[in-house]
């Protein structure tokens, strides 16, 4: 596992690298990607997603249910050698495998996603299979809080609890915004923790941008012998004052030269 300071620097560098890519390809979902960056850096570089160095592949599965933010994994996969540097450099070209929405033809991406509300169900199926075949594998599923509007999400949570899927960890990226605006204004989901606890699922709450607290929380959930759900409170567009907490930065937007330089300085 890397030191906390190293994790923080990696998260910042990945945001910076992705920002430059978005400038180049003029598309993407920076708000949602930046909100979950500290989470995925903790998972991968914190050693919670087991990696086979010889095969250059991950033993544990990670499903990004908020498929529009899958690109958060691209620089991580590149650094682990799962995704080639050539493929990273080709992102935005017609022949590139990399897209705004991830798909499982990309090395290291375990599921094609984008239509919301499906990955807890898919991850639960994987987790059941691993338990029945006695495989020492874990499944992580990252969803957006907006997916709590989907009935399929709650059905899958009930299924996971019923089958005691202690090899499944669900992470909810709570950045308080969806395309339409603030979740509390569109359809208030609070108290999320009480609702999920009410299903009998072990629930943790953490600042999704505090790397030290994230490491502690993932360590605690790792020791648990039941289904885990981590509620990570985040800021949409984290790292850029121009994007933070702004619904219009769900998608990529045009920037002035001054805004570009300001964002570069903030991500430096």
Task: Show the residue positions of the predicted features.
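Short, active-site-adjacent cap segments at secondary-structure transitions
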Residues: 71, 148-149, 177-178, 236-240
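N-terminal hydrophobic or amphipathic helices/low-complexity stretches enriched
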Residues: 1-14
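N-terminal capping segment at the start of a domain
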Residues: 11-27, 173-175
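Thiamine diphosphate
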Residues: 108, 112-222
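Generic beta-sheet signal
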Residues: 60-62, 137-141, 168, 224-234
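Short acidic, glycine/serine/threonine-rich loops at helix termini
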Residues: 74-76, 152-154, 180-184, 240-245
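Glycine/aspartate-rich loop-and-adjacent alpha/beta segment that forms the canonical ThDP
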Residues: 211, 216-268
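Cofactor-binding active-site loop characterized by glycine-rich and histidine/acidic residues
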Residues: 18-21, 33-162
């Amino acid at each position: 596992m890397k030191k906390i300071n190293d994790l923080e620097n990696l998260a910042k560098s990945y945001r910076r690298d992705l920002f430059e890519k978005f400038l180049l390809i003029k598309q993407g979902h920076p708000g949602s990607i930046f909100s979950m960056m500290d989470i995925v850096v903790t998972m991968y570089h914190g050693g919670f997603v087991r990696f086979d160095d010889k095969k250059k592949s991950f033993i544990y599965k990670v499903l990004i249910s908020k498929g529009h933010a899958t690109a958060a994994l691209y620089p991580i996969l590149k650094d682990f050698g799962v995704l080639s540097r050539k493929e990273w450099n080709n992102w935005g070209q017609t022949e590139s495998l990399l897209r705004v929405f991830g798909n499982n033809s990309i090395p290291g991406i375990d599921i094609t996603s984008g239509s919301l509300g499906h990955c807890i169900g898919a991850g639960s199926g994987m987790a059941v299979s691993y338990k029945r075949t006695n495989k020492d594998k874990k499944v992580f599923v990252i969803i957006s809080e907006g997916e709590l509007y989907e009935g399929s999400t709650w059905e899958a949570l009930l299924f996971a609890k019923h089958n005691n899927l202690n090899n499944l960890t669900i992470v909810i990226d709570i950045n308080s915004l969806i395309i339409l605006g603030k979740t509390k204004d569109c359809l208030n989901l609070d108290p999320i923790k009480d609702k999920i606890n009410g299903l009998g699922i072990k629930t943790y709450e953490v600042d999704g941008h505090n790397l030290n607290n994230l490491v502690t929380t993932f360590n605690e959930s790792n020791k648990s012998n039941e289904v885990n759900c981590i509620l990570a409170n985040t800021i949409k567009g984290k790292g850029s004052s121009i994007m933070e907490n702004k619904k219009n930065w769900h998608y990529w937007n045009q920037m002035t030269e001054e805004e570009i330089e300001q964002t570069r300085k903030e991500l430096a």
